[in-house]
Amino acid sequence: IYDLPADSLRATRGFLAVTGTLAKDRVTVIVCHWPSRGAGSYYRELAAKQVKAIKDSILHHDAERKVIVMGDMNDDPTNRSMHDVLLAKGEIEEVGTDGMYNPWYNVLVKEQTGTLRFRGAWNLFDQIVLTPNLVAQPSNKSRKGLHYLNHEVFRRDYLLQTEGKWEGYPKRTTAGGVWINGYSDHLPVVVYLTTK
């Protein structure tokens, strides 16, 4: 990801866009791993801008296509990159035609939990956001085809530290160069889709 020629030396990971058919609907999934927090918010906001441009271009050519953006955004749902640039909103009623629905916003804000912990506080960098045509608006309960049903942070005991200083944190594979037989420092997120 870079914006200016001078930035090309600092180019970061790109995006993977996969298009296909899921439950008879045309779907594109854009997988991301946005720049780290050490790089500053500018590059994550630039990533959000580029992902939004990709999503908008796809929908310009096929307005019925359902688009899912997912990955480690290295930002919370409340951060500018997600909320103001990608326009991923936490309330279905707030989602405009060019925006996306972010079910993780309220998980972080209201439930005060997330997918990783840093200095005792939860962050929710791992997100799956959806275009409006995947989400039934409260004013329109009729749903056609594939649509959003529910979501969860996949929190299971075997994924968490059960004792010591890091109790309750995601159980990493290694810590301080020592193998601790864990899975990841991030918990997975799941979005459930249905056709019913």
Regions found by a protein language model. Give the residues of each.
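Active-site-proximal beta-strand/loop segments in catalytic clefts of secreted hydrolases
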Residues: 1, 30-35, 70-74, 131-133, ...
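Structured beta-strand-rich core segments of catalytic domains in phosphoester-bond hydrolases
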Residues: 1-26, 34-35
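Second-shell loop/turn segments in exported
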Residues: 5-6, 34-44, 69-70, 113-118, ...
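Solvent-exposed, acidic/flexible segments
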Residues: 8-11, 40-48, 118-122, 184
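Conserved hydrophobic/aromatic beta-strand scaffold that supports enzyme active sites
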Residues: 15-19, 31, 127-128, 188-190
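Residue-level recognition of the N-termini of beta-strands and the immediately preceding loop/turn
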Residues: 27, 64-67
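A long, amphipathic alpha-helix that forms part
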Residues: 41-63
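Metal-dependent phosphoester-hydrolase catalytic domains
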Residues: 57-65, 75-196
